[in-house]
Amino acid sequence: MEQEKRVFSIDVAGRPLIIETGELAKQANGAALVRYGDTVVLSTATASREAKNVDFFPLTVNYEERLYAVGKIPGGFIKREGRPSEKAILVSRLIDRPIRPLFAEGFRNEVQVVSMVMSVDQDCAPEVAALIGSSVALTISDIPFEGPIAGVIVGRVDGQFVINPTVEQMEKSDLHLVVAGTKDAINMVEAGADEVPEEVILEAIMFGHEEVKRLIAFQEEIAAQVGKEKMEVVLYEPDPALEAEIRQLAEADIKRAVQVPEKLARDAAIEDVKAGVIAKYEAEEADEEKLKQVQEILHKLVKEEVRRLITVEKIRPDGRKVDEIRPLSSAVGVLPRTHGSGLFTRGQTQVLSVCTLGALGDVQILDGLDLEESKRFMHHYNFPPFSVGETGPMRGPGRREIGHGALGERALEPVVPSEREFPYTIRLVSEVLESNGSTSQASICASTLAMMDAGVPIKAPVAGIAMGLVKNDDHYTILTDIQGIEDHLGDMDFKVAGTRKGVTALQMDIKIKGLTREILEEALMQARKGRLEILDHMMQTLSEPRKELSKYAPKILIMHINPDKIREVIGPSGKQINKIIDETGVKIDIEQDGTIFISSVDEAANQKAKQIIEDIVREVEVGQVYLGKVKRIEKFGAFVELFNGKDGLVHISELAEGRVGKVEDVVSIGDEILVKVTEIDKQGRVNLSRKAVLRDARNIGGELPRESREKRGRRPERHRMKP
């Protein structure tokens, strides 16, 4: 049946949100064009007709940026978009997290959700349009999606919450919180905050959820008019008789195995049980499909037992209490030649973070859809396979590494000093050396220690902790500092980072359909208790940032010049500034207001570069005496360089008190002579007199005023001095 174009509209934060269906991408299972202000995003949802032979739900979410959306042509030689930007990967994950839990257990059809950003209005966030568009595309399609969901951004300006803040409002906001959910519950939260108390965070989440509910009602109206009938699918379920047989065979052994406290030993014990059961069925010559079911049933039994222990017996696999943190240890200064390093260990999770300081010219240049063009604070996260005792390829960062790195960056950025306070580019790299859950939060703790070790004057130390949840019917248990098995088999991974004062970042992923206010509140307060305990431990390792930077870190010298002189310092095609850099070995960054940052490991090189720049911008003053160098001789006089690039003419009549027949009788090229500035004419030409210097010296009955040479300050007396 031919689809007709339909247009639906609702007001969101004072701006129209328009959904168009039935005109574009009609071969997808579902498609929606979202217009929010001048932001335009096309979201599509497509599914395979047959289930895939896999043991997981194959969902892919892609957020595609197009630089034409902001009137840009991509840089480089290729001139087209390549791999997704970091922002695109983060938004893809942002959309994935709230929609993934809303597909039925056992659904194995491949689903792909694509949001293509076609036009960007900076006051109307494209990620919000993409999140809503993805939900609409799934909801009106024939894909069995148990939504809809919706999401909004919540800011806080002057103590008041704001939905989808504009760029101007965001600059004043101490909170950037993305909340998504169904009409009944919240199922995704992601935030960056400037040390905001937990109570305020909770109210912001609930404030955002009220708008979410309104947007869901809007989507339900759309689905009622243009929604397709859902396709019939067969959900994967293992053979009940086989499950009963394996339960009888392995349940007791699994109960013992999951309570082995140490991770590697527990994993080995569970694998031994599984291997024994699989070997039995292999001996019976079971086919591949049956063996696959055996493995899935065994996994289900392990999951059930872990969850039963936690919710019923309040026992965790490693024997801890539900609110107990694993043993902590930390150290700083572990790498001798780096600018700062911190090692943080929590149980069998261990992260080494390294802080590197650079000049402002080392900032990361961004070429994306946002207004931001550069970034001076970076946190990168690496997760090598040896951290979990496995082999594997060492490739570039994947989506998970980029997501964890960004979360750590968001958590630490509020405490990083401003460019004026600390004019350095800061790069943190977190190397995961051991992993048993909560590595992203361990990287925040290790990075805090690394910055303090490097002497970065952070406003306050930051720690992070991951909270878990196991929910069975109406009973639930919240876990502090979850380990790998609790994350894998539980219902929630709620990461909370902050200072003693408040939250700086949080991220919530869940596997169930949503959480209530009560669960969120309990998780936030339990996380605060754990965070303060970790901060107490970190302060025992290093209580405050070091007063001195590492001797291997660059030293930065700041100077100010008249902005009108910037072009003189740079020179034609950068010739002058490159000459200074080549001569001194420093890095130089110049801002439009005339502030110059000179950086080098060698303080003497900084001072040398500063002197050269001062000479370049120095103004010649009438009446002043300078020590100059004869650069050129003509019949009518000598041209004398006073300092870098500044010269003047000593007429032959001004070379000496008596009559001078030839210029060469008094001076030669290369001589250094004292001259007085007598005039700067309308054309900027400088007239000099050596005779005036001699006369002044004779009038006061003294010798030639040699102290005037100090005005030059830096040129050695390599040539003879003429009286």
UniProtKB/Swiss-Prot annotation:
Q: Which organism is it from?
A: Geobacillus kaustophilus (strain HTA426)
Similarity field: Belongs to the polyribonucleotide nucleotidyltransferase family.
- Where in the numbering of this chain does the KH domain appear? 554-613
Return the EC number: 2.7.7.8
Q: Does the record carry Transferase as a key word?
A: yes
Which protein are we looking at? Answer: Polyribonucleotide nucleotidyltransferase
**Reaction catalysed by this enzyme:** RNA(n+1) + phosphate = RNA(n) + a ribonucleoside 5'-diphosphate
The entry's Mg(2+)-binding residues are D487, D493
